[in-house]
């Protein structure tokens, strides 16, 4: 695979790629040595220098883990992508991710989403403008049924989905807009669909 590298150097390069792919950052010199059976850090440094001279990596000598993969055939630097469903409508009594609700998908790096179940909604209206959420924005929502006071949520009320700040009061739920010209909504019958964790906007 790498005709100008020895087997040991190939093992080192493949290990670096795997660690970057799995963890998002390169291994230390000691970790490389442990992985390929080299006790001497100076020997590892020697192999890294050869790999760098061959054009497969770039190092920053002032930092302990600064190894950048330059090999164009490597997928170590490629972020995996997930396609998040964009929900066109929210129907009472129906699962939010029901196929008929999904109008499109939006690509995001997997490390943004992690292992959460997420969806996106397009915001309609100006009730959350002071929170930086504008009419037409796409919001990224982590699906969950509970929320803490002050969190921005997507909630179902009167068979409609709304984006507001959540506050649990003595006997009622208050859904607070972030717009001084709009009044809060008070209700006992509120279903939390998820917490807003991101906002995406196209600037024209």
Curated annotation (Swiss-Prot):
Q: Which InterPro entries match?
A: LexA, LexA-like, LexA/Signal_pep-like_sf, LexA_DNA-bd_dom, LexA_repressor, Peptidase_S24_LexA, Peptidase_S24_S26A/B/C, WH-like_DNA-bd_sf
For this protein, the Enzyme Commission number is 3.4.21.88
Q: Which UniProt keywords apply?
A: Autocatalytic cleavage, DNA damage, DNA repair, DNA replication, DNA-binding, Hydrolase, Repressor, SOS response, Transcription, Transcription regulation
Example GO molecular function term?
DNA binding
DNA-binding positions: 29-49
* Residue(s) at site: Cleavage: 92-93
**Record's family?**
Belongs to the peptidase S24 family.
**Quaternary structure annotation from Swiss-Prot or TrEMBL:** Homodimer.
Question: HAMAP family per the record?
Answer: LexA
Q: Name it.
A: LexA repressor
Q: Which gene encodes it?
A: lexA
